A protein has these predicted regions:
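Conserved catalytic motifs of the protein kinase core domain
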Residues: 43, 87, 192-194, 214
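A glycine-centered beta->alpha junction motif in the catalytic cores
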Residues: 84, 92-107, 156-160, 270-285
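ATP/Mg2+ or Mg2+-diphosphate-binding catalytic cores
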Residues: 252, 275-305
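Alpha-helical scaffolds flanking conserved acidic
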Residues: 260-268
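An alpha-helical support segment within catalytic cores of ATP-dependent transferases
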Residues: 3-16, 115, 127-199, 210, ...
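Short beta-strand segments
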Residues: 47-51, 79, 196-199, 218-219, ...
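Active-site Asp-x-Gly
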Residues: 194-196, 202-261
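ATP-binding pocket architecture of kinase catalytic cores
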Residues: 23-141, 146-149
Length: 305
């Protein structure tokens, strides 16, 4: 830990020609750790992410730069990306506020105001459109169904291979098989407008002004896409977002498709499996939980609809 902090200090001073006053770990995620770095000149505070996944940090930097020009909420300005031995470092603005995963957010003065603030930011991002679907930097598909079918085939093949090797549970395979069987029905109705999706717009990646009960910004975009609006809604159902009833608020404001509830569970599961592909590891208990939720949602909704 001390050696890594010293490395960060040395790199920041070399790259930005400033003096570092302190380095403190302030967060940890699936792909790396984040350090709060105090320096002697503007911007005075930096967030420096360290990771063994250099390619992922390249993608994150590019996504942050792209997103910052197109949304109303704050996105960290990036300063440099470099690699030292086997560790990559991405330096960016430190957005002041409270992480949405902090327990203190449960005691926020005005939950309704916070909910509306988050929803307004999401709706603003969803007002940014493209005439094609797919990766944010190269959308080439005419429909969302066309893009997601190609994406899902990779998820399916990966899951099947893991299942055949006894590396993934049968309930996960069952859920993925259900998606494959009913794919054309579920995706029969989608939006014809591609909107810009952060890809990981859930509470731990949201920065909150506690006393104003407002969203300040968002960090850590993941697999950013031009997608149908419902793609990102699973993020609203996770963690404290569920307590705020963000998904219910979205459905009050917007007309959703007949199978929206299924797609929320489907996207959540496929997102976790995509992380498994990228990182080579997963939390089996959580994947099982997401699979069971999807199976239940599909049985309920397909029976009613």
């Amino acid at each position: 830990m001390i050696a890594l902090k010293n490395t960060i200090k040395s790199i920041v001073e070399k790259q930005l020609k400033v003096k570092v006053k302190s380095v403190r770990e302030c967060g940890k995620g699936a792909s790396g750790s984040v350090y709060k770095v105090r320096i002697t000149s503007e911007p005075f505070l930096l967030a420096v992410k360290s990771s063994q996944f250099y390619d992922n940090l390249i993608k994150e930097k590019n996504m942050l730069d792209y997103l910052s020009e197109r949304v109303s909420y704050k996105v960290p300005k990036t300063y440099f990306l470099c690699k030292e031995n086997d560790t990559a470092f991405l330096a960016m603005d430190f957005i002041k506020g409270v992480s949405g995963k902090s327990k203190i957010v449960r005691f926020i003065p005005d939950r309704k105001r916070l909910k509306n603030s988050i929803m307004d930011a999401l709706m603003n991002a969803q007002s940014v459109h493209h005439n094609k679907f797919g990766k944010y930097d190269n959308p080439v598909y005419d429909t969302w169904k066309e893009y997601y079918k190609v994406y899902f085939e990779d998820i399916y093949k990966f899951t099947k291979r893991k299942y055949d090797n006894n590396e993934i549970e049968s309930v996960v395979m069952e859920a993925v098989e259900l998606i494959k069987t009913h794919f054309d029905i579920i995706f029969n109705e989608t939006s014809d407008k591609a909107c810009l999706c952060h890809g990981d717009f859930w509470m731990p990646n949201l920065i909150i002004n506690f006393w104003k009960s407002e969203l300040v910004g968002a960090v850590d975009p993941f697999d950013m896409l031009w997608a149908e609006p419902e793609y990102e809604l699973f993020c609203l159902t996770l963690g404290f977002g569920e307590k705020l009833r963000l998904y219910d608020e979205y459905k009050k404001r917007n007309k959703t498709t007949a199978y929206c509830d299924i797609k929320v569970e489907l996207y959540a599961l496929c997102n976790e499996l995509n992380w498994y592909i990228l990182l080579g590891e997963m939390e089996h208990g959580y994947i099982i939980y997401r699979s069971e939720r999807l199976i239940k949602a599909m049985r309920n909704c397909l029976r009613k609809c």
